[in-house]
Amino acid sequence: LLGTAQTPGNGEELRLYQRDNEFSIKAGRHELMNSRIYGSEDALAKLACQKISARPQARVLIGGLGMGYTVRTALDELGPKAQVIVAELVPAVVDWNREFLAELAGRPIDDQRVKVHEVDVAQMIKIPDGGYDAIMLDVDNGPEGLTLKRNDWLYSLKGLSTACDALRP
């Protein structure tokens, strides 16, 4: 066990584990992510960024930092003037990415194109005229609130409509 953190809003404990070269983050008895398996994170970023990679100043929002794999793939897909904004609800996850997890994805949050906000991604989506070219939601391992019930809103018709309004044409 490398670290623990409380999830804002419900107080559920997140735990960061390491075994040999493998890391995992768990909430309760659920494994949220593991450094062995990150294909879905890569696929999410590739799918979103390939369609906008030709835009010289693409601006994307990623909900959930995780272990940094989505951010790394977005950076690899986008140009040198792109902006990658990350909303991470749990400050300790950001700290873990600076310390224990930094090398897993090649220190993506140290890239000058990245700005990390320790905030609920829903708040970032609700900002009028967010001006994002893509929004990637990688929270709660899917469309049902696993760590936070309020995350159900993100994948509701209202949440998706709000996200759509935050996109550039």
Roles of regions detected by a PLM:
Residues 38-169:
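The AdoMet/dcAdoMet-binding core of the Class I SAM-like
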Residues 1-56, 76:
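Rossmann-like AdoMet
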